[in-house]
Amino acid sequence: MTSIKNRTSIRKYSTKEVSDELLNQLLEDAMRTPTMGNLQLYSIVITRSEEGKKALAPAHFNQPMVTGAPVVLTICADYRRTTLWAENRKGTPGYDNILSFMNAATDALLFTQTFTNLAEEAGLGTCFLGTTVYMPKMIIDTLKLPKLVMPVATLTIGWPAEHPALSDRLPLRSIIHHEHFEDYTPEKIDDFYAEKEALEENKEFVRINNVETLAQVFTDIRYTKKDCEAMSQGFLEALKQQGFI
C-alpha cells in the first residue's frame, strides 16, 4: 500500500461527489478490521447534508473542512447494539463500565484507521478530527446518540483539492523499545527532537507564538493544562451521560 507512505491530511475538497456505492464499499471492506470478540463495537453516522454539517461544525471549533467536505463520518464506540441483542436473547449484559467503553473505543478507532487507509488508497482525501473528544456532548446532542453510544472519532472525506507537503515524523528509534521499556534520558530527548526543532516551519511556529521553544507552542498555546483538564471533565460527564460510568 503506497498511499500510507505519502499520506497527508486533506482539508480542502473538490465539488466532485463521493458516491454512495464507493462509500458503502469502503465501509464494508473496513469491517474486516480486528474487533474484540468479533462483536464490532462501533457504529458510523454519515453526514452529507449541508444542514447536518453546519450543526456539527461548532463541536469541531468550526474548522472549515467540516462544512467543506462532501462527507463527514462520526465513528462511535457502540455497546448499545450488542447490549440490546443480548437482552433480546436471554443474555445478561454488563457493559455499562469503563472497560467496555475502552473495548468499544478500541474497535471504533481500529475501524477508523482501516477505513482511512482504504479511502486514501482509492484516491480520496481524509482528515481525522481529534476535536471529537473535546466537546462530545455537543455531538451526542446533534446526532441524537442514545445510551452506550459515544463519539470517539470524526473523518472528513472527499476528493482532494490540495496536495500539502508531508508532515515531519520522529525517527523510528524514538518509538522502539527492545524487550523492556527504556526510559528517556535528556540526551535521547535531544536526539529524538533535533530534526523536528530544526525545521524552518517549526522555528516559525516558535517565533509567531512568541515563545522560546517548540515544546512551549504545544504546552502553552495549543494544548494547555487548563484546557485539557476542562475537556477531560466534559468527557467524563459525557461518558456518565451515555451510561459507561
Annotate each predicted stretch with a short phrase.
Residues 1-245:
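Acidic, surface-exposed loops and disordered segments
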